[in-house]
Amino acid sequence: MKHYVGLAITSIFIITGCSNNVETQPAKTETVQSQPKNKETANTIPQNFYKEITSGKIAHIHGIGYAGNMPGISIATHSGIKVYQNGKWFETATQLHDYMGFQATKNGFFASGHPEPGANFKNPLGLMKSSDGGNNLEKLAFYGESDFHNLAVGYNTEAIYLYNERPNSKLQQGFYFSTDNGQEWKNSKLKGLSSTIHSFSAHPDQSSVVAVSAKDGVYLSTDYGNTFELFSKSVESTAVTVSNEDVIYASINKQNEQMITKKSIATNEETNIQIPSLDSKDTIMYISQNPQNSSEMVFATMKANVFLSTDGGKTWKQITKEGSLQYN
């Protein structure tokens, strides 16, 4: 579900909402142990916290990425984090929270959202951080005050960008950034933006660089979101991620076809990446590239279809089909 939120005159954010639908809870089997280097990732997962599951369905996806301290692809859902790793699926044994604004980083993840029923947390969660796959959550800011549906965090810098939908004790409505784990915040002026914004992504190593996907293309800022320039024009861009060298974004062309494009920040060279055909009523909402392996990328759609490529987009395999977990 989406709804529109106005941000003064400069832009309009589309905020991904929550649903009351409950996801199917699959049976849990074996415990995940630390994994050796594999073709998709090469990190360490917390032992005895993630359990392998043999079936399941994701109702809504609230973020996707590669946490640097866990192997596999982490997917934030309405009821906790699920991880896809080499044809297998895992989920957390506890901490089944409704994570929103999920952002994977080198040392774990950042998120907001709502606690699971009965959990000893205030609602909403505010801004949280975890360095152990979600087993422990560190309260950074706005605990019990705000639910941030739109976050972007630098993979290595941990610079935080967020859109605050409603005023809280520190922030008015608007776009803000922090470079000290959410202790201090500065407002971004967003000069140069004039159309609907779908999402934004922070550069992994340069705190001042942030990209946004918008109604008329992709915009790029190098001064903490104070000024933006049109980086790539399209009919509409629905999702974006920034790597060290490229901006990778999903767009819709004049034929109403969805596509993914990789564009060099330094040279402006564009490469169109072939993707599987999608339903015209479905939309790419999240893209993530593996920071440890640039040939691997994953994207997720509004209807909870997730596709993975390990060869730079030459071939794809579907790992969820309208939310149903696929084992391949």
Outline where the language-model segments fall.
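Hydrophobic beta-strand positions that form the internal "hydrophobic ladder"
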Residues: 73, 109, 160, 209-210, ...
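Short loop/turn segments immediately following the C-termini of beta-strands
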Residues: 78, 114-116, 163-167, 215, ...
